[in-house]
Amino acid sequence: MIREPEFREYNPGQLEEKIEAFWKENNTYEKVKKLRENGPKYYFLDGPPYVSGAIHLGTAWNKIIKDMIIRFRSMQGYNVRRQPGFDMHGLPIEVKVEQALKLKNKREIETKIGVDNFIKKCKEFALNNLKIMTEQFKQLGVWMDWDNPYMTIKNEYIESGWFTLKRAWEKGLLEKDKRVLHWCPRCQTALAEHEVRGEYKMRKDPSIYVKFPIEWKEKEYLLIWTTTPWTLPANLAVAAHPEYEYAKVKVETENGEEYWIMAKALVERVLSEVGVKGEIVETFKGEELEGIRYTHVLLEEYPAQKEFREKYEWAHRVILGEHVTLEDGTGLVHTAPGHGEEDFEVGQRYGLPVYSPVDDAGRYTEGKWKGVYVKDADPEIIEYLKEKGYLVKAGEIEHKYPHCWRCKTPLIFRATDQWFLKVSKVKDQIIKENDEKVTWYPEWVKVRYDNGVMNSGDWVISRQRYWGIPLPIWESEDGEYYVVGSFEELVKLAVAIEVNGERIDLPEGYEEKLKIIEEKLGPEDLHRPYVDAFIIKVNGKEMKRVKDVVDVWFDSGIASWASLDYPRNKELFEKLWPADFIVEGEDQVTKWFYSQQAASVIAFDTVPYRAVAMHGYVLDEKGDKMSKSLGNIIRPEEVVQKEGRDPFRFYMLWATNPWENLRFSWKGLEQVKRMLNILWNVYVLSATYMSLDNFNPTKVNPEELPFREEDRWILSRVNSLIGEVTDGIETFRLTRATRGIYNFVVEDLSRWYIRLIRKRMWVEGDDPDKLAAYYTVWKVFDVLLRLMAPFTPYIAEEIYQNLIRPFVGVESVHMLDWPEADEKAIDEELEKEMEYARKIVEAGSSARQKARIKLRYPVRRIIIETEDETVKKAVERINRILRDQLNAKEVVVGKVERELIIKPNFAKVGPEFKGDAKKVIAWISEHGRELYEKGEMDVEIEGKTFHITREHVTIEEKLPDFFVAEEFDGGRVFVDKTLTRELLAEGLAREFVRRIQEMRKRLDLDVNDRIVVTIETTDENRELLQENLDYIMRETRAVEVRFEEAKGYVVEWPEVQAKIGIEKV
């Protein structure tokens, strides 16, 4: 049976701890899974958060969205795969471990601590953070298989990566190549394009103009501009655009007259910037510059440049390239094929060498600045150019520059040998598969994604690091390669292992090999240095592993099959794959969403997920990014502790459309908490009365109950709400769902329906009208709690346990089926009419306030003036509610006669009639009503004809003195403010009832407690009150009302000139 609520006040923290204990004690999560194990499969793929440590509001938002969708699909009957994932390899962890071990650089990993120990420390760090994050996610009420997460560090997962790379190799989509890439000199590894997006930060760099002497031309120079002086040692050409117009400019310098060549369009700006005067003496197309040779400005300091000059025809010449722009610089581009992507491409066309005299740490390997870090060499190079007379102007520029996404070091462009997935060969297929098979939420993101794929290059997947999936590529001494696809294949191909520099040959038998491998290397661990020990033989050649590891974005890119342990577990893969749904933040559009499709099309020729949703970022209330420097970081645990899990969860799904940025607001969160408090108060009120009456919804026949219009209306609304919430979740318009629930709870249920039925709950005995109200409230909660369960699982569970479970038997609200709308219960016309009724009540209340008539005092009549047929039907159909809520004896549709006051419109008459305006005004003052009725008239005044219309008058309505009016959307409400003795008596009775009820509340009397009321008041009040004594006694649960000296608990009420006493019987 229904019990009185345990908590009278809504306390999220207290309630949520109670429910957590309930779930734990009853093993509810496992029972929910067991219940749905035979349902249709739903493969939800958790995008693995990086195990960097504590979660932030963005991570919390992400997991709250996921948990809500998982709970929703489970209630729909699906057998949901809800395995959480964690991204556990990569540079971020390496950097943290290096800092903890006080290692200064990459070299010290091998010389001070050793690769084996470093890997162990990385693993410890990752697993420790996994535990921390798991507990934080649990604190958000997230139900996932926390005891069985997929981890990118597991052997099965790594083997899935090897399988994928083997497929790429077999398809000719895995290649080694020399390219110019972003390079982190601190981490000493290449970075892929997608790792650099979003990592451009403002910094100051040199901005220099340099003149390259043209050979065989005295005092003629090619003028270039660069922000990377450190790349000048690697300069091999100067690029010009073939179609641009260039100019030879005569300039006056300290050294006398010189001729500089630059783009004609930039002459004025460049001369202004460098501070010299000049004039154009000749112009020509860029293509005419091709082949002009110049003297390298650092020729004497870099011997290799002399060799290039002799060996390569196009070294130190002007070459042509359409990448040259007129946006900045001089229109002539210093070209170093070893340090720029476009430089590399154009250099390849002209057969130039890829020269990069810079090592992994960003230090020069030769020449004048050998051993110097390149950025440290900038000022020295500038000074050298100045001394040699090649520097035209040196300054500074503040611009966006790429930084390492983990250690924040400025990156450099550097040519290195790397391994690439040839995504360029399959990107058309990626786009085709995506467009045909993937549903995007919101839909417009698909276009953005396709554009990103179209513009993407090949994926550099090799990293010169340690903590990652080892690249499964073995190399022979003569440069032949082989890609291993599994641990089993590795063991079969292995002929020896190296342990501490000692070679140990292996027998031929597989089991015998395994025994020795485990004895010498320990249990299987497909990380470095374990896999580095294997020497394999292919085609008669012994091979050792390439030392690189795989880009960490590849780890998460294979998650949809690697988390299923494919190819080891083919059965699970065939049952579940591809994923039904994924959802991540906006930054993942060009990262995880892309890496998955790229890897999947390479491995399986199709996409790995059916539907994908994108959400925004969490910002502070002002729209600023949260950061330590701004001091505006808000931690999820802080929110949970202060406001509770349910308010936090609902707020994050209510505050904004999920694809937009969410500006976190404590005020907004408080607003949501108030809504849940309102829900709780409705529950407490309902459960209290139902428990007192031992209400049992299974013992009543709803077909025999006398449901009122308001009952049918709220049942219609809650069934309509099912559609709103379901559609909102399924189309990822989550605010449609949450705001629908919010408005229903606050406006429909609390402010309107409970307001309408409160008196029905007070009736004694098994009154059918009261039972109809009880049953309606119970039915509404039965639906509403199921709709709210995915959003606010705790409060939904608590209310369900007391109000619903005793009669349906199901152990948890989360084990119920998702509600289906009862179409027969939906009455759209009634919903529209009730909406108008509420507007009429609001307008009528406003009119009463104008007239200063309290709502407790009835009015004689209210007239609704409208032309809207729906409003008319509402007044007729819901008349009882309107009378009750407006405290009016009569509410009717009709017309109110009012006097029209017609005056001249001086603003119109004056400008139009000018000197005759006074005559026209006088005429309108006398004949205004006739003009109003006819609309327009031609009139003769003093022998002159004037055309006068309604525009020339203003019309004011004057109501009878006993009416006050207010407009609403659909018409006007007129309140008759005439007060009769009968109306005064009824109003005064209501005033006294309110005060007696307040006194009962102060004494904390139970609703069923009976009282005796004594009243000291004026003779006039006594006479008026005696006309409604039965009403006063019924409403206050009084057995007697006596007019005598107030006794018992006494309160003086000056505003009604009375002392009232109450005593419990």
UniProtKB/Swiss-Prot annotation:
A molecular-function term among this protein's GO annotations: tRNA binding
Function: Catalyzes the attachment of isoleucine to tRNA(Ile). As IleRS can inadvertently accommodate and process structurally similar amino acids such as valine, to avoid such errors it has two additional distinct tRNA(Ile)-dependent editing activities. One activity is designated as 'pretransfer' editing and involves the hydrolysis of activated Val-AMP. The other activity is designated 'posttransfer' editing and involves deacylation of mischarged Val-tRNA(Ile).
Motif annotated as 'HIGH' region, chain positions: 49-59
Protein name per its UniProtKB record: Isoleucine--tRNA ligase
GO BP annotations listed: isoleucyl-tRNA aminoacylation
Residue positions of motif 'KMSKS' region: 625-629
Cofactor: Zn(2+)
GO terms for cellular component: cytosol
Gene encoding the protein: ileS
Residues forming coiled coils: none
Residues that bind ATP: 628
Organism of provenance: Thermococcus kodakarensis (strain ATCC BAA-918 / JCM 12380 / KOD1) (Pyrococcus kodakaraensis (strain KOD1))
